[in-house]
A protein has these predicted regions:
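Short, contiguous, pocket-lining structural segments
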Residues: 18, 43, 132, 136, ...
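Internal, well-ordered alpha-helical segments in soluble enzyme and binding-protein domains
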Residues: 93, 140-143, 212, 234
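Short hinge/gating elements
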Residues: 78-84, 126-130, 202, 224
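Extended mid-to-C-terminal alpha-helical interaction segments
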Residues: 171-333
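Hydrophobic alpha-helical core bundles mediating ligand binding, dimerization, or RNAP-core interactions
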Residues: 52, 94, 141-144, 220
Length: 333
């Protein structure tokens, strides 16, 4: 399973507290506490995703994700920032950032789409539950923007995007986005896109240093190797991913996209492990149902809805097949 620095989670906790939210109940639910988080340790990517999804369900301010970017400082990116700043041009810095994007705090995937006059830095977001999706997209877009602006300030530059696309419907708070990013923002697109002028990409960076660049590249390569720490099967990773969702679970195609593979490859590899996507979806629903029955007082019909059943009768039938007992009998044991 992929791991990464726990600093991103710590920054999120600090930001949520300063913005008037209370992240501690969700941390406790996951066996964590801000007082005991060690900034030198690492966290499993899937576990961190689950924490963000749980936070999103309890947020009071719909603009929290947008505001979170300001809590991510350059120092938290370690040698990656110096690797980017020692590139020869802005274009090379973008390409290098894309190559080493696993050293950032992103869950989505970055790529660069060249154009005749404008090019786009594209963030393809990871599929997540509805509330978590906007929370994470806003945080990742604003965090990327903050990182680039901070680097520019260090180098004495002041370049801005020509426009920004966001991958969800226009919210009531849309005006806050144009004010935050200082450019037109278009909603309802498939991916997030920063539109950049090509002449800006050819700009020579005043901090270019090939010798230092080689040193920082070696350090970043070592960090990438440290991320792969365990040998969890694909089935285990898919099951963990499905555990993030309530009400509407993602399709096999959506899950495959989250793991950067085709649906066909996903199904084939699961089959080689003796599992199927359908079985894993049932396992995820069963695990969530057990947890809700034992740890909450939610009515049966509400639990049925949370695990994707429109009618409680269908849920009761499925649960009896899984557990050999009805939900009520299981809860009373």
């Amino acid at each position: 399973m992929t791991t990464r620095s726990i600093l991103g989670l710590i920054y999120m906790v600090q930001g949520l507290k300063q913005l008037g939210e209370d992240p501690e109940p969700v941390l406790r639910q996951h066996g964590l506490s801000m007082d005991t988080l060690d900034p030198t340790t690492r966290i499993e990517r899937a576990r961190e995703m689950r924490i963000y999804a749980d936070w999103a369900e309890h947020l009071h301010d719909p603009l929290v994700g947008l505001k979170m970017g300001s809590f991510f400082g350059l120092a938290g990116y370690g040698p990656l920032v110096m690797l980017l700043m020692t590139c020869s041009t802005a274009y090379e810095a973008l390409q290098t950032g894309i190559r080493y994007q696993r050293l950032t705090y992103l869950f989505g995937t970055l790529r660069l789409e060249p154009g005749e006059r404008l090019s786009a830095l594209v963030l393809d977001p990871m599929v997540m539950p509805h509330k978590a999706f906007r929370f994470r997209v806003d945080g990742e877009v604003s965090g990327t923007y903050k990182m680039v602006r901070d680097m520019q300030a260090t180098m004495g530059l002041n370049l801005r995007a020509e426009g920004l696309d966001m991958p969800y419907p226009r919210p009531p708070e849309a005006a806050a986005y144009e004010e935050h990013f200082g450019c037109p923002v278009r909603f309802g697109e498939h991916e997030a896109r920063f539109w950049l002028r090509n002449e800006h990409l050819q700009l020579k960076l005043p901090t270019f240093d090939p010798n230092a660049h080689a040193m920082y590249r070696t350090m970043c390569d070592q960090q990438l190797k440290a991320q792969e720490t365990t040998n969890d099967t694909l089935a285990e990773r898919v099951l963990t991913h499905l555990g993030m969702f309530n009400n509407h679970f993602p399709s096999a195609e959506d899950v495959a996209k989250s793991f950067d593979m085709s649906e066909r490859s996903l199904r084939r590899q699961l089959s080689e492990d003796g599992r199927s996507f359908r079985d894993l979806l049932a396992d995820a629903r069963y695990a969530k149902a057990r947890y809700l029955l034992k740890n909450t007082a939610l009515p049966i019909e509400d639990i049925a809805a949370q695990i994707g059943y429109a009618e409680s009768a269908a849920f009761i039938h499925a649960f009896r097949r899984w557990a050999g007992a009805t939900p009520r009998e299981f809860r009373e044991r």
